[in-house]
């Protein structure tokens, strides 16, 4: 048994060390998107760093996934026993973190610091990120190793948290299409790619609609209660809009749906009418006009239904609740 386990164990150890080394040397200049720090240095991120960070990370992840799949496949063929938990989940979680971190940080920046350049970068990189995510979630060797471990007598010796992790992975992979074959698998992956693009379009419409909405306030009574810092931001926005003499003390103030402006208004402003106006504008954002998301939402709902049926569910509600504590019957 030890002779059979040693190659897989060696791969597992190598994987855990290779990520840090490969990512550290992926680019000649330190890239903050690859920084191994407790808090990401977002202030140092520039658009030109995104593409090399994501692409180098994906390249490392592709190779690491191949190594893991080969090791697991060899183990599954050579030994009828279960693959130990330590040789499946730790390298798998390391893989999730390594390839997902730069893309996740970029997605956050895209949401809070949107620009045409960042949108173009997202459009260029998204297909490769989605494709790798599909390959990872539909990996037969990983699924088979997890399934064998779940069905083995040694599963009972795992901690409750470890058992939960194995079962959650199995469920996530089933919902990710691992059991689909042939035309169904191709259709599922095609729909997932379309859904990713639609989700991006939805977010873009929301950002554009938020950016298009604003109000200029001129009376002090209208902004009573709003913190001074928020008023300075609103006055600065007014100056940029052409009100050169705008000040935090005397206005005018330009308020928008940006969180740094809207949140203080909704929390502290004594002007009930202004709070209601901004709340309703935020609640109905991208529901009409040039950035209307109505058709995008219809397509998203349609694809969700198609995916649910491909996975054996009657509707998307059942699919969504499959990962939640409440059952479908409990909420319908």
Which residues does each predicted region cover?
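Positively charged, low-complexity intrinsically disordered regions
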Residues: 4, 17, 25-26
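Zn2+-dependent metallopeptidase catalytic domains
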Residues: 21-332
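Classical eukaryotic N-terminal signal peptides for Sec-dependent ER targeting/secretion
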Residues: 1-10
């Amino acid at each position: 048994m030890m002779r059979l386990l040693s190659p897989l164990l060696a791969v597992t150890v190598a994987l855990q060390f290779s990520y840090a080394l490969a990512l550290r040397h992926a680019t000649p200049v330190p890239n903050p998107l690859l920084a191994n720090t407790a808090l990401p240095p977002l202030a140092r991120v520039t658009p030109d760093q995104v593409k090399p960070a994501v692409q180098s990370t994906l390249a490392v992840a592709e190779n690491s996934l191949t190594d893991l799949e080969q090791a697991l496949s060899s183990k599954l063929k050579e030994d009828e026993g279960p693959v130990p938990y330590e040789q499946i989940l730790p390298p798998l979680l390391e893989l999730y973190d390594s390839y997902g971190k730069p893309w996740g940080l970029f997605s956050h920046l895209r949401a809070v610091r949107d620009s045409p350049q960042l949108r173009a970068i997202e459009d260029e990189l998204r297909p490769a990120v989605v494709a790798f995510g599909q390959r990872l979630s539909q990996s037969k060797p990983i699924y088979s190793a997890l399934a064998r471990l779940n069905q083995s007598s040694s599963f009972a010796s795992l901690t409750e948290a470890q058992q939960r992790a194995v079962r959650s992975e199995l469920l996530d992979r089933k919902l990710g299409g691992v059991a689909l074959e042939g035309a169904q698998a191709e259709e599922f992956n095609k729909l997932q790619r379309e859904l990713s693009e639609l989700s991006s379009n939805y977010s873009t419409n929301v950002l554009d609609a938020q950016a298009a909405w604003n109000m200029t306030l001129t009376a002090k009574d209208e902004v009573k209660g709003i913190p001074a810092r928020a008023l300075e931001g609103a006055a600065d926005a007014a100056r940029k809009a052409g009100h050169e003499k705008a000040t935090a003390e005397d206005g005018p103030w330009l308020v928008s749906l940006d969180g740094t402006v809207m949140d203080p208004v909704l929390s502290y402003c004594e002007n009930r009418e202004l709070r209601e106006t901004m709340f309703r504008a935020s609640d109905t954002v991208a529901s009409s006009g040039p950035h209307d998301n109505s058709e995008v939402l219809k397509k998203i709902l349609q694809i969700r239904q198609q995916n649910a049926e491909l996975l054996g569910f009657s509707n998307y509600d059942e699919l969504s609740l499959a990962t939640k504590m409440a059952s479908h019957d409990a909420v319908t």
